[in-house]
Amino acid sequence: LHPRVRRQRQMCIRDRTKRGQIGKPRIQIKADYGFSAPTMLPEFVDGAKYMEVMNVASQFSSGKDMYTQAAINATRNGTDPDLYPNVNWLKAVTKDYVPSGRVSLDINGGSERLRYSLILAYYGEKGMTVTDPGVEYDASNKLSRYNIRTNLDMNLTPSTEINVSLGGYILNQRTPGYTTSSDENPRTPFTDIIKLAFKNTPIVHPVIYSNGQIPANTSQTNPWAAATHSGFISSYISSLQSVFAVTQDIGKLWHPLKGLKAKATFSFDTYAWNSFLRTKKQTTYMATGRDADGNLLTSVTNEGDDYLKYSKEAGGNRTMYMEGQLSYSRLLADAHQIDGLLLYNMRDYVDADATSAINSLPHRTQGIAARLSYSYKGRYFIEGNFGYNGSENFSKGHKWGFFPSVAGGWLVTNEKFMESTASVLSKLKIRGSYGLVGNDQLSGRRFAFLSTITSGTGYVYGTSGNQTINGRFEGDFGIEDLSWETVKKTDIGIEIGLWDCINIQADYFHEKREDIFMQRKTIPETAGFNKNPWANFGIVKNQGFDASLEMNKSFGKDFFLSLRGNFTFSRNKILEYDESEAMKQTTRARTGNPLNTYYGLKAVGLFQEEDFKADGTLVDGIPNHTFEQVKPGDIRYEDTNHDGKVDTYDYQPIGRPSVPEIVYGFGFSARWKSFDFSAFFQGSTNVSNMIQGDMLIPGSGGGGLGNIYANCDDRWDPNDPYRQ
């Protein structure tokens, strides 16, 4: 564990870009081209099937059909798509695939006194939403990004080196104007448009009427119009990163201190964004029929705008970081490698998007860290680290946290008794580490040791009761003894190399997070808190394993092949949560379950005719479902607490957590002479997503929303209630 990452947030400079190398200028040009396509879109029924299924549901609830057979036939035959539409909204608003491309130029070279590296890159991609060629403005979804990075390394003297790294990018993103996500900066409407496509039924209206008018009812937006006729949002993002460092090799100035270096680093980063919103509401219509001549009759449902409206949004942040360090590295007697590091750092961050006076204040942290490592003849390794970090969020006496760690390793293949296996087993290393990591960030809360005072409506007075006196009251309650959240990390790993071309790495990891920041849940209202106070309360365990496999092999002098893959499994469990002992004994308990778990009722089957008495009530022994009156074919839920009724007290964990437990990837790279080709695939599993409301339930939103999934023929049928 590196001493600079004692804190669970970025606190240091990690410059991993290419540095200049001594030699003549080397120029490398690389181009990539790819495609993106949705791979797991749900399948919905078409319009006619939708009407038939809704008729079945309506018969159960009211004994009547919602749609006539003539309307169903007209929808299926497509004889009049204006009055009897049949639309697959997902296909109507998305493309089958979209292209993306990347081009980069890398120039590298230099001398012993000055080395340089320059990287220029462009990346562009098209978005998935469709456009209407008849629209006069550009409402397409697309992105362009331009990057530049330059590194200069200069030796002022034989013992003094200066490093300068400057980089940045400019990103231009254009999207349709429709958006409901006002909390995103900048906004990304694609998700909002896809949600509309999920909600709108295939029969609500066509994509566009034959007379060119845009259809929409009074309560829901036309997904196609949202993608093509809502104006556009043009966003610009710019970022600049700069790092300046001076390194002095003290050992070259005074030989007794050989191996000792001093380094000072300063960085300044800025991020800024602005969006121009040229949005427009389109006048929409709904068809009411046809006149005697067959012309389409429509009525206005929403009055639109005659022009594109204009508004703008902007924001950004800046970060200043300083670091000073002393490092020591020396090999003694050709056997004992000793390395040491001592550093101090400080960080100042200002959020230009701050929404309150408190959050507009600079975020400041500082700390010291140290590392000492020893290795013997490249076989045995041991290392110790510590970080001592201060935080603005805690009171005096609790601001500083101490986070030590230790690591060790054994490179078995460097032992003499392993020399006979070198042709096959090129590397075998066993390693392990244990350490403590700290976190000082509370979600949405700064200076947690201070109470906040806010204002609001006080009391009403006057003969008519329309006079008020505003007052002030306590908001967040300050907690003096709040301190660092800590994580104990253990890692045991092995590295294997075979035939100098195959590398295998496997790690088991275990983490125990303690003193987790959370707002107390079990404090009674009689305590008088306006907001539940924060506390170091909570324990979560996380464990799993990580593995990777890589093969690099040359076939002759012209062909090179690389194969690689990785797999990670991680599962967590809440060991302590602020809930009563009585709650812990129920299925609703958070304790004992993973983070990000969904809770709900567990379906145990469907109600059948024999579950009901003649008067329609449930037979004895079947729990009463309190949400609504149930009928044959309705879902039957488990009464987990065995109190004879099904209600919110019967909630239990359902599905998987919302964060994947398994992440994997695999790919390859091939090079023949001066040409190379690579591909990489990645995925995740053991994860659940909750789809509910208008996204799931047909007939919701007053009956006009909610699609029906294509597997609806699996539904309960009174004529065959027990089919599988």
Regions found by a protein language model. Give the residues of each.
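Glycine-rich phosphate/pyrophosphate-binding loops
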Residues: 115, 380, 672-692, 699
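Non-catalytic regulatory/gating segments with a bias toward low-complexity or hydrophobic composition
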Residues: 14-15, 244
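Conserved small-residue
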Residues: 28-79, 178-179, 185, 554-658, ...
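Extracellular/periplasmic, surface-exposed regions of secreted and cell-surface proteins
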Residues: 151-159, 165-170, 179, 191-197, ...
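Transmembrane beta-barrel wall of Gram-negative outer-membrane proteins
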Residues: 91-173
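Outer-membrane beta-barrel transmembrane strand signature
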Residues: 70-108, 117-121, 206-251, 340, ...
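Single conserved hydrophobic/aromatic residue that forms the stacking wall/gate
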Residues: 2-9, 13
